[in-house]
């Protein structure tokens, strides 16, 4: 909620939503692009009409936050151009976006969820491409080339 309050105070919320060039939100940036987040019960930017949920461990071995390497599957976005198999990327998060019409890649941790979103000129990743080695570099290069 603090981040959204800052964006509103600086009048950046409307500016971000009006951008026409490609925009990439990473981790919290992806969550802020959604409609609402259970983290702080915050209303967000609403670019993606979907809510952010908190992971609820279902088994003893399920740890929250989800930290570490995991795979991207069902990739279908320009961010993943050149991907021909499941790729590993790095995650650190306690909240997730359920699968929805904007899902650009899927990851499974506790349950399947959206690890990337895409709508118009807005792209978002729950994982950290900047911490994901050569795969992350390829994703960032693909974004720069949009």
Where is each model-derived feature located?
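Histidine-centered divalent metal-coordination motifs
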Residues: 27, 93, 128
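C-terminal and late-domain segments of enzyme folds
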Residues: 96-146
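Active-site acidic short loop of glycosyltransferases
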Residues: 21, 85, 119
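Flexible gly/pro-rich beta->alpha loop and the following alpha-helix that scaffold active-site loops
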Residues: 1-24, 30-42
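Hydrophobic/aromatic beta-strand patches that form the interior of the parallel beta-sheet core
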Residues: 24, 46, 90, 123-125
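Pocket-forming structural segment of enzyme catalytic cores
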Residues: 12-13, 35-111
